[in-house]
């Protein structure tokens, strides 16, 4: 009987210790998973990119590349670039890239956003426009942002948020008629790659997202800086050769 008792007692003791350790582990895990945020440099423009499942790579990465490279130019007000989404989990782009958002706009305290970028996403012509929280967020950011830009069908989001009323805009060429039918009160132009009207810059998207981003940099920093940024990405840049419209 004693031979059975002591092994049984040992098993019970080890089991209790194991349970005690397991109870402590979730606390350690919770601490280790505490969210950390980017360090944003002062005296820079804060540039937020709105991302979600189905975001198209080029409309995100083209302006992101151009704007991020401003930190390597001297004597200018460079840009802090970061992403915002409605989740803490990775989003999956249309092409399959997985990206962890820097901020969750539903939960986190966001920095002031100076420049807001809305790349196109797969469902910007339908279900995304029914996302009330997202549309409300866009409206809220617009109140303080100095510039708001869209690429490709990102213009549909701006239109749904009622930001393009009284403004001239453009979108992905084959979706212009769709946008005109959906928002008949808007002035939507074709045969241009981007439109600058007030604080809003809307572009045709795709690879031409580079041109719209370079235009904003030229507008903010001048021709030489824009050419330098373009050269760093092996892009021939001359705004005069790009079909565009600036509304004065």
Outline where the language-model segments fall.
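Extended, subdomain-level signal for the structured scaffold at the beginning of enzyme domains
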Residues: 17-148, 156-159, 177, 190, ...
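A conserved active-site-flanking secondary-structure segment within enzyme catalytic domains
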Residues: 165-191
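Conserved Rossmann-fold dehydrogenase catalytic segment
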Residues: 189-204, 234-238
